[in-house]
UniProtKB/Swiss-Prot annotation:
Keywords: 4Fe-4S, ATP-binding, Cytoplasm, Iron, Iron-sulfur, Metal-binding, Nucleotide-binding. Belongs to the Mrp/NBP35 ATP-binding proteins family. NUBP1/NBP35 subfamily. [4Fe-4S] cluster 1 binds at C8, C22, C25, C31. Its cofactor is [4Fe-4S] cluster. GO terms for cellular component: cytosol. Its main location: cytoplasm. It comes from Drosophila willistoni. This is Cytosolic Fe-S cluster assembly factor Nubp1 homolog. One of its GO terms (molecular function) is ATP-dependent FeS chaperone activity. Binds 4 [4Fe-4S] clusters per heterotetramer. Contains two stable clusters in the N-termini of Nubp1 and two labile, bridging clusters between subunits of the Nubp1-Nubp2 heterotetramer. Disulfide bonds: none annotated. ATP binds at G62, K63, G64, G65, V66, G67, K68, S69. The keyword Iron-sulfur applies.
Length: 310
């Protein structure tokens, strides 16, 4: 097959070979005929690159702004601290809004090329990170890409980054069920990759967030992705002065607990809206060693996650 046109819908799309962008493409007859479609060669490359990565965990959210990237960072920090003999990687596939370089304190770092591929940026002795944020000329640069180009970038991150031996790779995704999700699932749901991908879904207590979380759960079920559980973020506000908690987002329909019962998925736990966490996210500081209600709740969530892998 020759190189696809710029706005190619992708060889696995139901519209492959049928949309206007396909007109004149030398591969149109192949893509439009289901009997002639070829397996994406990227799948074999991804399987080879991830052969030493034991577990893959998608961090998902149906709604934007629920703190999915923050939860990804907190999970990574706590797991790395509590399991110093294990190695963890973070892959930021929120192509248009990469947050992990800021959250993990790696803004301004550069990705280096070696004989075995891109070297992810080291965060701690047992944590590394890859993000498109490291490839931009400025943190303010906008990424204006259509689906096929995002798909190509994700394939590169999965197949051309030298992840080495990892016990867990956490993938921070954009909200919704968009091109990025379909791409990463198509590459990770592969019989050649052991211990295939699982998912954690992040929400807040109010119904406007839970509506989209239900869609995300159904997406996982349709794609055959096991759901480790749901994390309810910003479940309450913890005052930094008196330590008392109050509801910011009222759970008028029962919050994540009721939704998990309804959808038959586990509730991993709840995290409060803590000013210390907000400050740490802006500075890239690790505060998981502190003793407070937030880190205690985080510890319980991480224990349930690790138990699910065992």
């Amino acid at each position: 097959m020759e190189a696809p046109p710029e706005h190619c819908p992708g060889v696995e799309s139901e519209q492959a070979g049928r949309v206007s962008a396909c007109a004149g493409c030398p591969n149109q007859s192949i893509c439009s005929d289901p009997n002639k479609k070829l397996e994406d060669p990227g799948k074999a490359l991804v399987a080879a690159a991830l052969k030493d990565v034991k577990h893959k965990l998608l961090i998902l959210s149906g709604k934007g702004g629920v703190g999915k990237s923050t939860v990804t960072t907190l999970l990574t920090r706590y797991l790395a601290r509590s399991c110093p003999d294990n190695n963890f990687g973070v892959l930021d596939i929120d192509i248009c809004g990469p947050s992990q370089p800021r959250l993990l304190g790696a803004v301004g770092e550069n990705v280096h090329q070696s004989g075995s591929g891109w070297s992810p940026v080291g965060i701690d002795d047992n944590v590394c990170l890859m993000s498109i944020g490291f490839l931009l000329g400025s943190v303010d640069d906008a990424i204006i890409w259509r689906g096929p180009k995002k798909n190509g970038m994700i394939r590169q991150f999965l197949s051309e980054v030298d992840w080495g031996n990892l016990d867990l790779l956490l993938l921070d995704t954009p909200p919704g069920t968009s091109d990025e999700h379909l791409s990463v699932v198509s590459y990770l749901k592969n019989d050649e990759i052991p211990n295939s991908v699982r998912a954690i879904i992040v929400t807040t207590p109010q119904e406007v967030a839970l509506l989209d979380v239900r869609k995300e759960i159904n997406f996982c079920k349709k794609q055959g992705i096991p759901i480790v559980g749901v994390v309810e973020n910003m479940s309450s506000f913890r005052c930094g002065h008196c330590g008392n908690s109050s509801e910011i987002f009222p759970a008028k329909t029962g919050g994540a607990a009721a939704m998990c019962t309804e959808m038959e998925v586990p509730l991993l736990g709840s995290l409060p809206l803590d000013p210390l966490i907000a400050k740490a996210c802006d500075s890239g500081e690790d505060i998981t060693a502190m003793k407070n209600p937030t880190t205690e709740a985080l510890a319980a969530i991480c224990t349930r996650i690790m138990d699910s892998f065992n």
